[in-house]
Amino acid sequence: IEKEGLTVSHDSIEDIDRLILDVGKANVKGGVFAVCSKGVLSFAKGEMLENSTLRSVKVSDEGVYQFGNKEIEFKIYPFDGKIANVHKKFANCCLDYDKIKGEIVVENRREGEKIRLVNRDFDSDVRKLVNKSFRLEDRSSAVILKDSQGVVFVEGSGAAERVKIDSETVKILAFTIK
């Protein structure tokens, strides 16, 4: 890595380590990509064509919405304020409906987006969350839910702290991704 003029960091080594186990490429610094193909690791400069042309989908009501090859079903439920023991997989697909600002939109990630996940005291880069949860060829179809204030959910990682369900919640937006 140093031979290519790049600084060695935990993140870049982790990205390259993942590549060696798979096939693909990762941006390690400012337009320089680590590329792994047929068991050979190399470095290249250029643009990574990771962003998909999947169109944005506005969620206007309950129902099933198509996003690329995925179906997302949205339902709104009343909530009595009692927090029960809920399986983590289901809880990550539930948001406090009244804390959502404006319309929900399903779309691809955009450069520089951040999210503060539930029970975390720091912001996470959406790109890094998607890279960690999805193989290179599946990243462009990762479901990202946004409202007028930013990202509220990242598939494979969870919901934003600002829309988490708490004792003040009146309505829940629940969704499943198929």
Language-model features, listed with the residues they occupy:
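AMP-forming adenylation/ATP pyrophosphatase catalytic core
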Residues: 1-178
